Structures are given as structure tokens and as C-alpha cells.
Regions:
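Expand to "…catalyze enediolate/carbanion chemistry for C-C bond making/breaking, isomerization
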Residues: 1-263
């Protein structure tokens, strides 16, 4: 089976830089995959992407050096299994708040006896190789999103779930639930404390600590804080930012420092 290079990168104590796709286009997925990202994630939760589009995007990413990942819309086992069959080498699952939810998520990603994933890898065989089913349980990456107060309370139990590789903070939802305002770069004391705790517990339990960021600068700061899996904005945010900068430069204006959210 084709190895999951993200696990090698993390084992060498190098951070994973992850691209993020919300635009339903295999062409833009291919472009992003060629930019040097370690991984590129197809977003089925907040991205404007259906399964048919996701399939072609995963095919496009597979032609690059980036590892193809998917954020599923929810923790429904059928959806998780389907994106894995389509060739995703990892799943980011939103709104995980308990150890029980984590176990169900991980189980859907693993073939028996470690889990309940149904056999039918389809494109997984094409991308992963003929021995896919023998090694998929080891290679497929599992990240549970921490974005609720309940998830923070149950963080230790979530991280102790057998087969879970780590967690990925959804900062907008986490900020919304903790402070009443959605802000990926919130400096509210409760938000800062929550982020510090996630990093600390992941380090102690040797798990991946991931987070969505609004820019490369913000991603670098998160790495300095101890995160080892960062997403420096999504394609919508990057396209908008590049366009605003180009327009400002053409008009001789100051480059804007803020803009619309990627969602």
C-alpha cells in the first residue's frame, strides 16, 4: 500500500502544512496540490462540494505529492466509509464531543477486527495499491474536531480513544461556544486557555494537535505554540486575499489587511 507520508512527517517532528478546499473544482484541487502542501483537505462540511465533485478532486490531488484528506459533513459511518473508498487517506470529523462519538468515528475508519468499516475500497485500491486492505488500518489518518465546550471537558477521554491519531481545533465554532463570538484568532482568555490545554494534552499523549488558521502568518504562530498540523486558510480566503492585494497594488492603494471569511 502507498504509505501515508503525513505519519512519516509527524514522526520526524516536522509540522504538516495542510491545504483546504471549499471550491468544487478538480482544477483548483490540482493547483493546490502542486503548491507544496503536505496534505490537501476536501471540505464536505462547509465547502460547496458534493460527493461527485469530491471524487474528482481526490483524483486530482492524487496526481500531486500532497496527501488527500477529507473533512466529512458529519460522523455518519456511511459517509466516512464512502470518502475512504474514494481514496481519502485521512478523515477529519467535525463536532466530536465525547469518547463514544470518537470511538464510532474511528471504528468507521478501520476494517475488522479493529473497526466496522465495510469492505469495498473501489478507488482506494487504485490509489493505495492492491494490498490496500492489509495496511489501511495503519495508514489512514483520523482527526477528531474539538469545537465544543463538551469536547474540551472530555478531551482526555477523546485522546485516549484507541486508533485516534489526534484532534483538530475548529476555532470559529470553539470560539463561538466559549465566548459567543466566532473568531479563528480570538484572544479571549477562555479561548487562549482552551487552545493551550489542547496543545499540552496532545503533547503529553503523543497525539496530533491540529488547527485551522486564517493565514500563513497565523499558522506559523500556531506552530510556535506547539501545533504540528496547521491549515493556513482555505482556497476561498486565499483567492479573495490575492485578488484584493492585486487590485490595491494596481490602484496604488495600501494592501488591505482584512477581508471576508472563507465561510
Amino acid at each position: 500500500m502507498r504509505v501515508n507520508n503525513l505519519k512519516r512527517t509527524l514522526a520526524e517532528n516536522r509540522p504538516v502544512i495542510n491545504g483546504w478546499l471549499a471550491i468544487p473544482s478538480s482544477y483548483s484541487a490540482e493547483i493546490m496540490g502542486h503548491q507544496g502542501y503536505d496534505a490537501v483537505t476536501v471540505d464536505l462540511q462547509h465547502g460547496m462540494i458534493d460527493f461527485a465533485s469530491a471524487l474528482t478532486m481526490l483524483q486530482a490531488i492524487s496526481a500531486t505529492s500532497a496527501v488527500p484528506l477529507v473533512r466529512v459533513a458529519d460522523s455518519t459511518p456511511a459517509q466516512i466509509m464512502r470518502v475512504l473508498d474514494a481514496g481519502a487517506y485521512g478523515v477529519i470529523c467535525p463536532m466530536i464531543s465525547t469518547a463514544e462519538q470518537t470511538q464510532r468515528f474511528v471504528s468507521a475508519c478501520r476494517y475488522p477486527p479493529e473497526g466496522v468499516r465495510s469492505f469495498g475500497p473501489a478507488r482506494g485500491l487504485l490509489y493505495g495499491g492492491a494490498d490496500y486492505s492489509l495496511h489501511a488500518n495503519r495508514e489512514i489518518l483520523t482527526l477528531a474536531m474539538i469545537e465544543t465546550r463538551e469536547g474540551l471537558i472530555n478531551l482526555d477521554a477523546i485522546l485516549e480513544t484507541e486508533g485516534l491519531d489526534g484532534v483538530f481545533i475548529g476555532p470559529n465554532d470553539l470560539s463561538l461556544t466559549l465566548t459567543g463570538t466566532a473568531s479563528a484568532e480570538s484572544t479571549h482568555p477562555e479561548m487562549l486557555s482552551a487552545i493551550e490545554r489542547v496543545v499540552s494534552r496532545c503533547r503529553d499523549k503523543r497525539k496530533i494537535a491540529g488547527i485551522f488558521c486564517t493565514s500563513g502568518t497565523a499558522a506559523a504562530q500556531r506552530i510556535a505554540e506547539g501545533f504540528n498540523f496547521v491549515t493556513p486558510a482555505n482556497d476561498v480566503m486565499q483567492l479573495g486575499r490575492a485578488s484584493r492585494e492585486a487590485i490595491a497594488l494596481a490602484r496604488g492603494n495600501a494592501i488591505p489587511t482584512t477581508g471576508a471569511s472563507g465561510y
